[in-house]
Amino acid sequence: DLLEEAKKAKVKQVVFMRACTEFGEILPSVDQEHPLDENHPIWPSSLYGSIKSSIEGFCHYYYKSRAFDLAILRPVTVYGVRPQLDKSEWFQTIDYLATNYNVDLKGSTKYVAVDSVVQAIQKVIGNSEASGKTYHLIDGHIHNLDLGKLIAETIDSFGECEGVMGEDGVPMSNKAAKDLGVEFPGQKRIVEYIKLIHKLQGEYGGERNIQNW
């Protein structure tokens, strides 16, 4: 068990990160004025969610027993350039629109830039005030159809974006992370990312996966 080994090794701090997706049932009190925060109970609706939730429980057990300091980070969909370029978030959409293909899009995405995630890690490491706390890392929410149109506009594509709007999703709070000092740049960072992926795609290419369309 990794946590037990960390205790034996006298590790001073553990930072546990997991996807912020598995809350299961959402309380009816959650709305735009009262977004889902870190205190919301977790009732996983899948085995995967149950496992992730149980790991958080183990982490808190070791923290409460004073084995080590603990901080938990829960990012939503993280976007950023990956070493394997075509695995970068939204690469396929950018690539297809860059070659003026039409794309069909549906659904929606809660997003956070990898820069913000790294910043959060830096803010909690060695920070005693963050010990025992959980932080949601979310910058915003965008419909994939709107994202496609933003991509087309940013790279001057002649390709058209078709499809249906996704659901608005559950409002989530990032107040705790902001109070920690994490910055969330919003859609302007997405535009910068789109331009960077477009530039890198032109220089290095990437593997197209037509089955996804």
Where are these regions (language model features)?
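Conserved sequence/active-site signature of Rossmann-fold short-chain dehydrogenase/reductase
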Residues: 22-23, 78-80, 142
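Conserved Rossmann-fold NAD(P)-dependent oxidoreductase catalytic core, especially the SDR/UDP-sugar
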Residues: 1-47
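Mid/C-terminal beta-alpha module of Rossmann-like enzyme folds, strongest
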Residues: 108, 120-169, 173, 207-212
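Amphipathic terminal alpha-helices
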Residues: 187-213
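Conserved catalytic Lys-bearing alpha helix of Rossmann-like short-chain dehydrogenase/reductases
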Residues: 2, 11, 51-59, 114
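NAD(P)-dependent short-chain dehydrogenase/reductase
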Residues: 60-109, 114
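Active-site Tyr-X1-5-Lys
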Residues: 43-71
